[in-house]
Amino acid sequence: MKRTFQPSKRKRKNKHGFRERMASANGRKVLARRRAKGRKKLSVSSENRHKH
């Protein structure tokens, strides 16, 4: 049986990245909540610079 987590850096960036969050109203709400909570990392884009 294939496992559910099949990691891919590109998919991770495209689905959960900062630009993707900013693209929708709900995504912006996510970022606002994370800012209010004081998260060091707002999105997965905060990890490192390269899109693999």
From Swiss-Prot:
PROSITE patterns: RIBOSOMAL_L34. InterPro entries: Ribosomal_bL34, Ribosomal_bL34_CS. NCBIfam families: rpmH_bact (TIGR01030). It comes from Christiangramia forsetii (strain DSM 17595 / CGMCC 1.15422 / KT0803) (Gramella forsetii). PANTHER family: LARGE RIBOSOMAL SUBUNIT PROTEIN BL34M (PTHR14503:SF4), MITOCHONDRIAL RIBOSOMAL PROTEIN 34 FAMILY MEMBER (PTHR14503). This is Large ribosomal subunit protein bL34. Residues 1-52 are annotated as: Disordered. Residues 1-16, 30-42 have a biased composition (Basic residues). GO terms for biological process: translation. GO terms for molecular function: structural constituent of ribosome. Belongs to the bacterial ribosomal protein bL34 family. Keywords: Ribonucleoprotein, Ribosomal protein. Gene3D superfamilies: 1.10.287.3980. It holds the Pfam family Ribosomal_L34. GO terms for cellular component: ribonucleoprotein complex; ribosome.
